Curated annotation (Swiss-Prot):
Subcellular location: Plastid, Chloroplast; Plastid
Domain Ferritin-like diiron: from-to ranges: 82-235
Full protein name: Ferritin, chloroplastic
Pfam families: Ferritin
Keyword Iron found: yes
Gene Ontology annotations of biological process type: intracellular iron ion homeostasis; iron ion transport
Keywords: Chloroplast, Iron, Iron storage, Metal-binding, Oxidoreductase, Plastid, Transit peptide
Self-association state and partner proteins as the record states: Oligomer of 24 subunits. There are two types of subunits: L (light) chain and H (heavy) chain. The major chain can be light or heavy, depending on the species and tissue type. The functional molecule forms a roughly spherical shell with a diameter of 12 nm and contains a central cavity into which the insoluble mineral iron core is deposited.
Length: 254
């Protein structure tokens, strides 16, 4: 016996908010009422009006119209500067001066130990390399200042002594203790710059100081501390010459 063909409407989707199997036009949007739930006193419902139906979340051509994003047109005004406080700019210029002054002190120490009547070539090499490293730090800060749209302002460098003899300690120990105090001072100044960055909510400056300077600084302090301890053990006699030879062949700048 042949069965009459049944008339079945094509499946066109169903609503998640109606009963299961309820036929719905596929061109209509799906209801989001199944997300309207409460947990305790908190409403976790999602309104259909909050769902970006177009998929557009970021509209760059509209957002770049903000006044703070406008490109300056006045002369002598940085085009790159953004979220860079005047206090941060001043702190960087001051740190540049700190690094140059430290370099100047180390260069004077190099000249002293390189004399023909002192002739401690290892100390001379160590302090010359330290001077060059501090100068490189100053140049790195200058480059960062320009990167952020600041203006480099160089301050005067103070005169430094040229004699480092010390009756009780000897010139070698006295000079190395001076270097240790200098590295601690530079570290203190760098931490001050980091505090300025935190106070002005400048994470980029804070990251720059942390990644480029602070870790290296504590390592330098540790190394020179060891040099001071060793020089205290060897005294002012023949041991200084042996220590100088170790610096000449193995030592590196702070």
């Amino acid at each position: 016996m042949a069965l009459a063909p049944s008339k079945v409407s094509p499946f066109s989707g169903f609503s998640l908010s109606d009963g299961v199997g309820a036929v719905r036009n596929p061109t209509c949007s799906v209801s989001l009422s199944f997300l309207n739930k409460k947990v305790g006193s908190r409403n976790l419902g999602v309104s259909a009006s909050t769902v970006p139906l177009t998929g557009v979340i970021f509209e760059p051509f509209e957002e770049v119209k903000k006044e703070e994003l406008a490109v300056p047109t006045a002369g002598q005004v940085s085009l790159a500067r953004q979220y860079y406080a005047d206090e941060c700019e001043s702190a960087i210029n001051e740190q540049i001066n700190v690094e140059y002054n430290a370099s100047y002190v180390y260069h004077s120490l190099f000249a002293y130990f390189d004399r023909d009547n002192v002739a401690l070539k290892g100390f001379a090499r160590f302090f010359k390399e330290s001077s060059e490293e501090e100068r490189e730090h100053a140049e790195k800060l200058m480059k960062y200042q320009n990167t952020r749209g600041g203006r480099v302002v160089l301050h005067p460098i103070k005169n430094v002594p040229s004699e480092f003899e010390h009756v009780e300690k000897g010139d070698a120990l006295y000079a190395m203790e001076l270097a240790l105090s200098l590295e601690k001072l530079v570290n203190e100044k760098l931490r001050s710059v980091h505090s300025v960055a935190d106070r002005n909510k400048d994470p980029q400056l804070a990251d720059f100081i942390e990644s480029e300077f602070l870790s290296e600084q504590v390592e330098a302090i540790k190394k020179i501390s060891e040099y001071v301890a060793q020089l205290r053990m060897v005294g002012k006699g023949h041991g200084v010459w042996h220590f100088d030879q170790s610096l000449l062949h193995d030592g590196h700048a702070a």
